[in-house]
């Protein structure tokens, strides 16, 4: 069977990727063991991942979807969302809060008591020092202002960055060393991070891994093109410039599927107006 040939721009893109890039991080997170190693390092404790879904899309109560870089379920039932962010071009804390709320609502069964609401940890990894206070890792706690006591509500947010190195203690040292692997394409550390290093080596230094990455880059490019077409159609329908039946046909979707996709992306589906008796005359 002939191997797929990829264009030069795809190959060139793949040869520049590091784990901070969504496409490589997604492939890295297809390995449960790799996710387990990342999370254990950042939490500073051994944990067991029983399920992981890279680039998971889930819906909030209004039907709007959010795309997560990586969502893991731990043995004790806690959900961990790991996000990577290269550019400093978003309201990062609002994104973390939104992700956590959607995961909580999505993973909490109906009719349960509040004490059984899903517990969520969001780990937000950036290339830049998000708070500018010179720490490689930040833990955000709920503190009672009047007493200074820390209260927990089942949500934990942790911010990690690759811009600051600190070797004052074991946690900071481990996090700093792990971030080196996120930013330096050639660097491996099989002694300290065997699973991460093995997975990264596959995509950086082997023909098989490069081929997988090329396939993923091309797949994401096709998805972006398709998404751009859909958004144009959604905007046309929402603004009244296109009939929803025509737009659904152009998108190769059934009418109900098209309307569902509009709602998932936050667009308003125009309601069909009923003709009154007076208007019919």
Where are these regions (language model features)?
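Short, charged alpha-helical interaction segments and adjacent helix-coil junctions
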Residues: 2-15, 23, 79-85, 170-281
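Accessory alpha/beta interaction modules
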Residues: 1-156, 166-168, 273-281
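Interfacial alpha-helical end/capping and short helix-turn segments at domain and membrane boundaries
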Residues: 161-162
């Amino acid at each position: 069977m002939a191997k797929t040939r990829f264009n030069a721009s795809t190959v060139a893109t793949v040869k520049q990727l590091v784990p901070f890039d969504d496409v490589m991080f997604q492939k890295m997170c297809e390995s449960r063991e790799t996710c387990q190693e990342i999370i254990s390092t950042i939490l500073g404790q051994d944990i067991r991942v029983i399920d992981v879904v890279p680039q998971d899309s889930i819906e909030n109560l209004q039907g709007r979807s959010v795309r997560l870089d990586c969502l893991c379920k731990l043995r004790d039932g806690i959900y961990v969302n790991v996000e990577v962010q290269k550019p400093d071009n978003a309201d990062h804390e609002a994104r973390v809060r939104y992700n956590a709320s959607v995961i909580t609502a999505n993973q909490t069964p109906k009719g349960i008591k509040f004490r059984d609401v899903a517990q969520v940890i969001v780990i937000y990894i950036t290339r830049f020092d998000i708070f500018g206070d010179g720490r490689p890792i930040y833990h955000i706690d709920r503190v009672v202002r009047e007493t200074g006591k820390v209260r927990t509500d089942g949500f934990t947010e942790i911010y990690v960055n690759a811009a600051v190195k600190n070797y004052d203690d074991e946690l900071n040292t481990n996090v700093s060393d792990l971030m080196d692997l996120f930013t330096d394409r050639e660097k491996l550390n099989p002694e300290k991070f065997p699973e991460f290093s093995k997975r990264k080596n596959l995509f950086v230094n082997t023909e098989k891994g490069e081929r997988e990455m090329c396939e993923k880059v091309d797949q994401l490019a096709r998805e972006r093109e398709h998404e751009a077409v859909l958004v144009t159609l959604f905007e046309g329908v929402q603004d009244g410039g296109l009939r929803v039946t025509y737009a659904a046909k152009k998108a190769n979707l059934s009418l109900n599927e098209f309307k569902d996709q509009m709602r998932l992306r936050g667009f308003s589906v125009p309601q069909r107006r009923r003709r009154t008796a007076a208007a019919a005359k």
